[in-house]
Swiss-Prot record:
The lineage of its organism: Bacteria, Pseudomonadati, Pseudomonadota, Gammaproteobacteria, Enterobacterales. The keyword Iron-sulfur does not apply. One of its GO terms (cellular component) is plasma membrane. The keyword Disulfide bond does not apply. The chain crosses the membrane at residues 8-28, 35-55, 75-95, 105-125, 127-147, 159-179, 203-223, 235-255, 271-291, 297-317, 326-346, 374-394, 407-426, 449-469. It is found in: Cell inner membrane. GO terms for biological process: ATP synthesis coupled electron transport. This is NADH-quinone oxidoreductase subunit N. Its main location: membrane. Coiled coil: none annotated. NDH-1 is composed of 13 different subunits. Subunits NuoA, H, J, K, L, M, N constitute the membrane sector of the complex.
Length: 485
């Protein structure tokens, strides 16, 4: 098989991140220098992000039977690269005080980003599985990076065992679908799995097992048990990656699968996904209400956010608006999560033991760091879906899709979930403006806004407010992110 120049250009983000992995490995082997390796990582991710412009100029193309590069894959690749860039930036000050090898952290983030990019372009069940594994395996190490802390090690082992079980379900489900259809590419699955075939027992069993595997990766109810513990145990920069790139890349691949294979049109699959979405929205929001740890709270909140996105996924075959909804919602979720976890990272760095993740640590933050508490307030308002923030447009789109698709009970769940969510987001905001306790020690540097992590947090908050007030540029961008059908 000969690879043309157009195919090479289409693969450029993947190739650039792969090359960065090799360069960082060689730098570690030659001489350990934390600053040099962090800089190499950030430069590599930025070049990969810039290369998306040239990928767009080259136009949509099938690189191999496994990968399809089009507007949709470019959009998700961009989001994964932004999340990886933010994770590396937040990790730098945290790693400054880390007593063991620091440089491998960036290596693991880059390999996970490679998996995310592969998932974004996946057009075949094989590339879907390889992408998921390439994304998950480095996360085992990243979650347990603070291994001297019992909670981090416990989170890593828990995530590893449950992830291995979920991957085996996913693989077995793919095997059953292949046994029934004789093909593994998304487009061929769409042709071979016609409506009368979808009720075959073997096929339903395969689909069920795939839903279990993918539900775990997206932390949907009832496969969400790992989420709060892993978010709490993982270092704050790793929780950032888990909440953003880890979810966005998998959701992008699932979107493509549902677009090409008409599984979502099957009534039985719609009902199962509807029940999962309903349970995720209510469970995530109700459980978050009683949390006093901000990382656990954001973990439960992410379960609810993926439940909202599932409403659009159910309607993706029949409603053009659903694709746009997912795009707008994910951008809002990305920037809000980067900002919220970024504040936790800034409060926690450098590595000295547990993160500053209890709500008590944020009590009276406004009187010490007014701009940082304003950023946190904006992020909470956006996650709650309050007008004039980007999160509001995401929720509005989800409700519009739910009404258009006549998913009344799910639309009701979104409204109820948002009302419950407002309560616990307000709890975080109120604690920021209470009287500060005397004995509370804060690690945040006075010049936090001039650090790289501070700049990322400020850019995220500006993006949330700008697109919340003037969403047209974002909507135009999302409309370009069309799949090649």
């Amino acid at each position: 098989m000969t690879i043309t120049l157009q195919q090479l250009i289409a693969l450029s983000p993947l190739l650039i991140v792969g090359l960065t992995v090799v360069v960082v490995m060689l730098c570690i082997a030659w001489r350990r220098n934390h600053f040099v390796n962090a800089t190499m990582t950030v430069i590599g991710l930025n070049i990969a992000l810039l290369s998306l412009y040239f990928v767009g100029q080259a136009g949509p193309t099938d690189v191999t039977p496994l990968l399809r590069v089009d507007g949709l894959s470019m959009f998700y690749t961009g989001l994964v690269l932004l999340a990886s860039l933010a994770t590396s930036t937040f990790a730098y000050p945290w790693l400054q005080g880390y007593p063991d090898n620091r440089d491998e952290f960036y290596l693991l983030v880059l390999i996970a980003a490679l998996g995310g990019i592969l998932l974004s372009s996946a057009n075949h069940l094989a590339s879907l599985f390889i992408g998921i594994e390439l994304l998950s395996l480095p996360l085992f190490g990243l979650v347990g990076y603070a291994f001297r802390q019992k909670r981090s090690l416990e989170a890593s082992i828990k995530y590893m065992l449950l992830s291995a079980a979920a991957s085996s379900f996913l693989l077995f489900g793919m095997a059953l679908i292949y046994a029934e259809s004789g093909d593994m590419s998304f487009a061929s699955l769409g042709k071979s799995l016609s409506d009368h075939q979808i009720h075959e027992p073997l096929l339903l069993a395969g689909l069920g097992m795939m839903i279990v595997g993918l539900g775990f990766k997206l932390s949907l109810v009832p496969f969400q048990l790992w989420t709060p513990d892993v978010y709490q145990g993982a270092p704050a920069p790793v929780s950032t990656f888990l909440a953003t790139a880890g979810k966005i890349a998998v959701f992008g691949a699932v979107m493509r699968l549902f677009l090409y294979a008409p599984m979502a049109d099957s009534e039985s699959v719609r009902i199962v996904l509807g029940v999962i979405a309903f349970a995720s929205i209510l469970f995530g929001n109700v459980m978050a209400v009683s949390q006093t740890n901000i990382k656990r709270l954001l973990g439960y909140s992410s379960i609810a956010h993926l439940g909202y996105l599932l409403v659009a996924l159910i309607a993706v075959q029949s409603h053009q608006l659903a694709l746009e909804t997912v795009g707008v919602y994910l951008v809002g979720y990305l920037f809000s999560s980067l900002g919220a976890f970024g504040v936790v990272s800034l409060m926690s760095s450098p590595y000295r033991g547990p993160d500053a993740d209890s709500l008590f640590s944020y009590r009276g933050l406004f009187w010490h760091k007014p701009i940082l508490s304003a950023v946190m307030t904006v992020m909470m308002l956006s996650l709650a879906g309050i007008p004039m923030t980007l999160g509001f447009f995401g929720k509005f789109y989800v409700l519009a899709v739910g009404v258009n698709a006549e998913l009344w009970w799910l639309t009701g769940a979104v409204v109820l979930g948002s009302a419950i969510g407002l309560y616990y987001y307000l709890r975080v905001m109120v604690s920021l403006y209470l009287t500060a306790p005397q004995q509370l020690q804060r690690d945040t540097p006075n010049n936090w806004a001039l650090t790289a992590g501070g700049v990322v947090v400020l850019i995220s908050s500006i993006a949330v407010l700008f697109f919340g007030l003037y969403p047209q540029p974002l909507i135009s961008l999302v409309q370009l992110a069309q799949p090649m059908l």
